Amino acid sequence: MSGFYHKHFLKLLDFTPAELNSLLQLAAKLKADKKSGKEEAKLTGKNIALIFEKDSTRTRCSFEVAAYDQGARVTYLGPSGSQIGHKESIKDTARVLGRMYDGIQYRGYGQEIVETLAEYAGVPVWNGLTNEFHPTQLLADLLTMQEHLPGKTFNEMTLVYAGDARNNMGNSMLEAAALTGLDLRLVAPKACWPEAALVTECRALAQQNGGDITLTEDVAKGVEGADFIYTDVWVSMGEAKEKWAERIALLRDYQVNSKMMQLTGNPEVKFLHCLPAFHDDQTTLGKKMAEEFGLHGGMEVTDEVFESAASIVFDQAENRMHTIKAVMVATLSK
């Protein structure tokens, strides 16, 4: 894919609708080739650096397996495995790694960090997650949606995101809707809406591409006719305990449960989640939530919905690897 060669992958709005579609087509082909045993290694001899200032299961495994499948080698630099930002600036780190590696993945904090890496590295840089955007996740989501509704184009699909929409997932969903023409509905309390400027920009683009973007606090109105309902965690272990109570009180009414799924009026509605999910008390945080806030059946999603036939979250998780592979192949091979 010569049009992508040596490009960065930092946020979705850096691309056109046609470019996004070609990445999804490549991901689908790579997935089919892997499953049929016909995959051709395009990245043999390439060296890839994986910078993780925030730990991850899916992102790390996806990049590593995708790289190995394609014949590349990886170096993992974890939260304590480099001098980035401590003894060496991002700018200097970029210039060092760019001399040794063919591509660099960054998962961490501010978007300005991955932008600086891209400016100075001289090799493709990929955003594995920042505070502001999570573009590789949305690629996986879009591929999963295509697979489960093959008879519809994106501008015939309705995607609902319920919960805290002011985070990197909300922002990247706005950008995805802008490029694909999805009917995107962010169903959340006003305190959890994304920045107005990004909403305005993405809504205008979405409408040009045959879709729309709606923000509402009304759950029943927001989920009506949805093809997919998506949510993400409400709290994380790194946050102060006082924040937990505040966030849970704010978002309780936006939990994805069987009632919300029924309110769609669509018996075929599917459930999406970028994972990890607090749907039971089998994790340290899930157990704390159950004990302190009575959330025994799940937090942002009930265990009933998570384990139901409507849940396609593990298809999503698998597709992280196929779509990340597409990004690497597109940007590192001519």
Curated annotation (Swiss-Prot):
One of its GO terms (molecular function) is ornithine carbamoyltransferase activity. Its main location: cytoplasm. It is found in: Cytoplasm. Belongs to the aspartate/ornithine carbamoyltransferase superfamily. OTCase family. The lineage of its organism: Bacteria, Pseudomonadati, Pseudomonadota, Gammaproteobacteria, Enterobacterales. This is Ornithine carbamoyltransferase. Transmembrane segments: none annotated. PANTHER family: ORNITHINE CARBAMOYLTRANSFERASE SUBUNIT F-RELATED, ORNITHINE CARBAMOYLTRANSFERASE, MITOCHONDRIAL. Its EC number is 2.1.3.3. The gene is argI. The keyword Transferase applies. Pathway: Amino-acid biosynthesis; L-arginine biosynthesis; L-arginine from L-ornithine and carbamoyl phosphate: step 1/3. InterPro entries: Asp/Orn_carbamoyltranf_P-bd, Asp/Orn_carbamoylTrfase, Asp/Orn_carbamoylTrfase_sf, Asp_carbamoyltransf_Asp/Orn-bd, Orn/put_carbamltrans, OTCase_ArgI.
